[in-house]
A protein has these predicted regions:
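Glycine-biased, low-complexity coil/linker segments
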Residues: 8, 15, 25-26, 173-175
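Short amphipathic alpha-helix that is part of the acyltransferase structural core
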Residues: 16-73
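Conserved beta-hairpin
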Residues: 73-92
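Conserved active-site alpha-helix within GNAT-family acetyltransferase domains
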Residues: 90, 132, 140-165
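Conserved acetyl-CoA binding element of GNAT-fold acetyltransferases
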Residues: 97-112
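Conserved acetyl-CoA-binding loop-helix of GNAT-fold acetyltransferases
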Residues: 112-127
Length: 182
């Protein structure tokens, strides 16, 4: 099962139930289907080079607005920091999910050179204020993995969870240090 057809099938199946419970296996399947890296056609479309410089700008604008829109939808669910400059020089957003062992940074985007690293550091500091003893995990936006690989000097390490690339920065001291000592 892959692509939009698979996602719609899973959603219909979940909505048709009388009981609202959803198993972890079903959530993983839905994540694989909805995540563009899980669908070869979507993955190919993501990496298709733009036909012209004008098209590239249009695509960048579309991506910024799409992520900003997605962030707006989630503002009520999870604490989110999002910003967008009207001069199109920068769009940035991060989302903190404190309900798990890891603090997740689900979205992070910057389209201006040099500001991505600062946004990442700001998001990390916000996550550490939220839960000082927990490590911080970042789910990279497909196609942005190279940027995060360059952040290793700041303590970010690449891993894979459920077949998806993630970047984790461990907590300094506290519970994380105690677990390593065991």
């Amino acid at each position: 099962m892959s692509g939009l057809t698979g996602a719609l099938g899973l959603i219909q199946k979940l909505l048709g139930r009388k009981a609202p419970e959803v198993s972890m296996e079903e959530l993983r399947a839905l994540r694989r289907v909805l995540h563009p890296a899980g669908d070869p056609a979507a993955r190919e479309a993501l990496y298709t080079p733009p036909t012209s410089e004008a098209q590239k700008l249009t695509d960048n604008e579309f991506n910024r607005r799409m992520i900003a829109t997605e962030m707006q939808k989630k503002l009520d669910e999870v604490p989110t920091t999002a910003f967008y400059r009207s001069d199109n020089s920068l769009a940035g957003a991060y989302q903190l999910s404190p309900d798990k062992w890891d603090t997740d940074l689900a979205y992070l985007l910057s389209n201006q050179p040099g500001l991505g690293t600062q946004l990442l550091e700001d998001a990390y500091k916000a996550a550490k204020q939220l839960q000082p003893d927990r490590r911080v995990r970042l789910n990279a936006i497909p196609g942005s993995e190279e940027f995060y690989r360059k952040q290793k000097q700041y303590g970010w390490n690449e891993g894979v969870q459920e077949g998806m690339p993630v970047f984790i920065r461990r907590a300094r001291g506290g519970l994380a240090q105690a677990r390593r000592a065991l």
